Regions:
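Start-of-helix register in tetratricopeptide repeats
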Residues: 8-12, 46-47, 77-80, 112-114, ...
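"A position-specific structural signal for the A-helix of alpha-solenoid helical repeats
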Residues: 12, 16, 51, 81-84, ...
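Alpha-helical adaptor scaffolds
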Residues: 19-22, 35, 49-54, 116-120, ...
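Structural motif corresponding to the intra-repeat A-B loop/turn of tetratricopeptide repeats
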Residues: 24-25, 59-60, 89, 124, ...
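TPR-repeat structural position
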Residues: 27-28, 62, 92-93, 126-127, ...
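Single-residue signature of alpha-solenoid repeat helices
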Residues: 30, 65, 95, 129-130, ...
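Alpha-solenoid helical repeat scaffolds
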Residues: 35, 67-70, 100, 131-135, ...
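TPR/TPR-like (Sel1-like) alpha-helical repeat modules
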Residues: 70-77, 87-108, 162-175, 230, ...
Length: 270
């Protein structure tokens, strides 16, 4: 049918005109051409919406791109456009809300990790939001070393993360996780002490474990045991945190010269 072919051709020409108008900064013209293209050939409705999103991204207007894409069912290409728009929008809440739909179409783990870290930092101290956010993540993100570590750091009530950290350490020994395990709450303090003391059998030479134990003993009001653990941690080449903790303990005990040495080391290692 020649009239149908003419409509096809005219519709495509109008889409091309919309692209040209966008490139020239003629926003009113762009919208007019997009509307006329669909009026001329209704089968171009989806193509016009996708083009509208592409053009919005080109002019760095992620909100317009997301509005357009939210009106259609996503396929792989449209989902990639939505991902670009979300990255450009810098709105972690909108990104989190979009993740379940995007996961169905391609691997979102890298993006999910990025967004999770932003959200977990933004909600630091707001445990209800942190727990909900962490629970909503896919398994890959929840098992990410960076994501789990940030979740633990952001929590004000550390008991929420104790089983997760202990399970992660049991699965694969990780000195950073072990150090975090020492950042305790009173409710899980005994359980943490028992677990950490049990790890000594296999990991007696890990400075992070002695740092962890030092923190736990300090919270348990066992300053002598804390001092021994922090001392062992720094002897094994532990991090600046061990020197800082030991320095503060020594100062509290009136041993200011030794304290100053460790605090100076903590600063020099930073």
């Amino acid at each position: 049918d020649r009239s149908g072919e003419n409509n096809d051709s005219k519709g495509m020409n109008l889409l091309s005109a919309a692209r040209a108008a966008n490139n020239q900064g003629d926003h009113e013209g762009r919208e007019t051409y997009l509307r006329k293209a669909v009026e001329t050939d209704p089968s171009l409705s989806r193509a016009a919406i996708v083009l509208s999103a592409e053009l919005a991204l080109r002019r760095r207007d992620p909100a317009a791109a997301l509005t357009a894409l939210d009106s259609i069912k996503l396929n792989g290409y449209a989902a990639e456009l939505k991902l670009q728009a979300l990255k450009m929008s810098d709105d972690w809440r909108a990104s989190m809300a979009a993740l379940p739909g995007l996961r169905k179409l391609f691997d979102t783990e890298s993006f999910e990790n990025e967004i999770a870290l932003i959200g977990l930092r933004a909600e630091a101290g707001n445990d209800a939001e942190l727990n909900a956010l962490f629970k909503s993540l896919g398994a890959g993100a929840r098992n990410s070393r960076e994501v789990l570590s940030q979740y633990v750091k952001s929590l004000s009530y550390k008991a929420h993360a104790e089983p997760l950290l202990r399970a992660a350490i049991k699965k694969s020994w990780d000195s950073d996780y072990v150090s975090l395990y020492g950042d305790a709450d009173f409710d899980t303090l005994k359980a943490r002490c028992k677990a950490a003391e049990g790890w000594l059998k296999l990991h007696e030479e890990d400075p992070a474990l002695h740092y962890c134990l030092g923190c736990l003993y300090e919270l348990s009001n066992e300053p002598n045991m804390a001092r021994e653990s922090f001392t062992r941690s720094v002897e094994l080449g532990g991090s600046l945190k061990g020197h800082e903790k030991l320095g503060l303990l020594l100062a509290h005990n009136g041993e200011f010269e030794s304290s100053a040495q460790h605090l100076k080391l903590a600063l020099s290692l930073d």
